[in-house]
Regions:
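Broad hydrophobic/π-residue packing in well-ordered secondary structure
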Residues: 4-6, 14, 84, 95-98
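Conserved acyl-donor/pantetheine-binding loop and adjacent beta-alpha core of acyl/acetyltransferases
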Residues: 70-81, 87, 91-114
């Protein structure tokens, strides 16, 4: 068995990140494809802007994928997606999203007093 290496995502690993998501992350035919693990770190307004951009690209799965990918590229370059890539030799084979709790807009909600 090959040794697995774990590396924190950084802009210099952008190519590996997208190679993983474009070619291996959903090779099982998952209904979640396309995904770049970025929507969790986006506000509702940012997601709506991404949807609008997808419509400008012609809509459908291709418009959505292009908009989603462009948004993810920008987020990786600015350090807004944080996590770890797993490598088998030089090939990215796994991903773990590990951002700050407050950056998971869909999950983090301040406690409400009842």
């Amino acid at each position: 068995m090959n040794e697995i290496t774990i590396k924190a995502l950084s802009p210099d690993l952008e190519k590996d990140y997208f190679d993983f998501f474009d070619n291996r992350a959903f090779s099982d035919g998952s209904p979640y494809y396309p995904c770049y693990c970025n929507a969790f770190n986006m506000s509702a307004g940012e997601i709506e802007a991404m949807r609008d951009q997808a419509k400008q690209y012609g809509g459908g799965i291709e418009g959505w994928k292009r908009s989603l990918r462009e948004t993810a590229v920008r987020m990786v370059r600015h350090g807004l997606i944080r996590g770890y890539l797993a490598f088998d030799n030089d090939l990215a084979v796994g991903w773990c999203n590990a951002n700050d709790r407050t950056n998971f807009y869909g999950f983090y909600r301040p406690c409400e007093i009842i």
